[in-house]
Every structure is written in C-alpha cells, then in structure tokens.
C-alpha cells in the first residue's frame, strides 16, 4: 500500500524522468526587475520572495538537463546579460553560471545560495533541501530586489511551518530507515531525524555516474533487506543498479532536483514550498 500511494503522490509532486511531453520553460511574475536563476527551484524561491517586483526565468527546467554538465546557449547568455539579479546554487552544482556572469558586460547582482548560506565547501551542495539555509538565501534575494513588502515574511513563515513539520517527524521518530540513492536530500533526512543507511561509496558512485562495485552493491542490498527501510531515488537518474534495488522493494518514493511537472502536459504543478512539503509528507508516511 505504501509503495502504491508513494508512487502516485511522487508522480504528482515530482518531475518524472520519462515525461511524455517536452517540459515547458519556467518563468513567473511580470515585475520590472529581471531575475535569472540557474534552475526553476531557485527561480521559484525568487518568485515567492520578490513577488510583483520581478519577472523571473530559469535556465534549467528539464530533468534531462544536468546542472553539472549543462552547456548554456547564446540565448542563456543574453538572458544573463539583461538580468538585474542572477541567482545560482553554487558549491560546484551549477558552475556554468559563473562563466555566464563573467561574460556579462554589465554585471548583475549575483546571489550565490551556497555562499550566502555559509555552508562549508566540503558539504553537500544541494542546499535547497535545507529550509534553514533557504531562509538565509531568501533574505539575500529580498535585499537584491529591495523588497520591503510582505512576500519575504510570508515565505519565511511558510519555511518555519515546514521546519515544524520536520521537527514533528524527528521528535516522534517517524521517518525511520531511508536508503537514498544520492545525497541530494540528505539535509532533509537529517532534519526529519531519518536514519540514513546508504553506504557512502554507493551514493558517491551514483552521483559521479560510476558503476557500484559488487561489494558495495551487496552492502546496499543488505541495508534494504532490513524491514521498514524506505528506498528514496532521484527520479531524473536512471541506472541498472538502482533498478536492481527498486525491483520488488516495497517502501519506495522519488525525489527531484527540479520543480514538479505534469508528465502528460508538462505543466507545472507547484512551487518550491509544494515540492519540499511533498517530500516531507513522504518521509513521514507510515510504513
């Protein structure tokens, strides 16, 4: 029952790696301040914070686009050249943005989320799954667009509610054992009090697109064999070794690096807050 409901909910909340239509470019707002974000996740955060003051576009909105190896187009460079504010994840996640900004003859205000958050360079760069760090980034975005209305306060209030939901899971020890195929959601797992049973060598190999060794694969299978262990996999990544783990496993859900889209229409089904809330809901599902 868990698997069935989890997969249905994941298909609504998260991007499918096998969308049947071409994903639609992401943009929001119509204000005079032009914001360009590296991904639609950060674009959504910017839109929620800037409100009516800005128009926001994202360069990456398709699960087939890998931020680590993304090759920007001339159109992408023009978008950055015309931007008033540029938002990037940083931490080695979207280095293509550094090159685009460097080539801009009239540099925009740059918000580097990883740098703003103060995260150690050796830490996980997927900081949009850490609601505390996103709050700090939101303040930097608000300062960049000189936003003094209620948008920032409303966004931070929503983040506080998500944090409260995570704390509830942690105190109640609800989450339990989770095997995450990649470290993308590690911040969320920590905040929810989950027991991350993923062998480090496994997640590192998958993230670096290398084959997992037979010995590590055996460790992974043993970890998943423990009753109550949930398999969390990145739905934009395909791997025969991940498929082996998924085969026949009961507790399973997907997580993404981009905003949710309808697999049939390509339409967006939610914003950043919806995405994180959906992931938290899955972590707290009774198994």
Tell me the role of every PLM-derived stretch:
Residues 1-22:
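Secretory targeting and sorting signals
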Residues 18-287:
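Extracytoplasmic metal-acquisition and chelation regions
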């Amino acid at each position: 029952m868990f698997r069935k409901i989890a997969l249905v909910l994941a298909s609504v909340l998260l991007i499918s790696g096998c969308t049947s239509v071409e994903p639609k470019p992401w943009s929001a707002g119509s204000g005079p301040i032009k914001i360009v974000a590296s991904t639609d996740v950060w674009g959504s955060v910017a839109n929620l914070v800037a409100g009516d003051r800005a128009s926001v576009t994202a360069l990456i909105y398709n699960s087939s686009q890998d931020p680590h190896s993304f090759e920007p187009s001339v159109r992408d460079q023009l978008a950055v050249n015309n931007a008033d504010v540029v938002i990037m994840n940083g931490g080695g996640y979207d280095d293509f943005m550094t090159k685009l900004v460097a080539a801009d003859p009239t540099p925009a205000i740059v918000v580097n989320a990883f740098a703003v958050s103060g995260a150690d360079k050796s830490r996980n760069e997927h900081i949009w799954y850490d609601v505390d760090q996103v709050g700090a980034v939101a303040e930097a975005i608000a300062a960049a667009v000189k936003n003094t209305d209620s948008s920032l306060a409303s966004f931070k209030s929503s983040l506080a509610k998500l944090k409260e939901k995570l704390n509830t899971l942690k105190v109640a020890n609800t989450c339990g054992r989770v095997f995450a195929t990649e470290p993308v959601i590690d911040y969320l797992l920590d905040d929810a009090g989950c027991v991350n049973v993923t062998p480090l060598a496994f997640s590192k190999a998958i993230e670096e697109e290398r084959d997992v060794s037979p010995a590590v694969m055996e460790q992974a299978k043993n970890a998943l064999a423990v009753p109550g262990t949930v398999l969390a996999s990145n739905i934009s990544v395909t791997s025969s070794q991940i498929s082996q783990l998924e085969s026949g496993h009961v507790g399973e859900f997907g997580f993404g690096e981009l905003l949710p889209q309808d697999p049939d229409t390509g339409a967006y089904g939610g914003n950043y807050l919806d995405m994180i809330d959906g992931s938290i809901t899955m972590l707290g599902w009774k198994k």
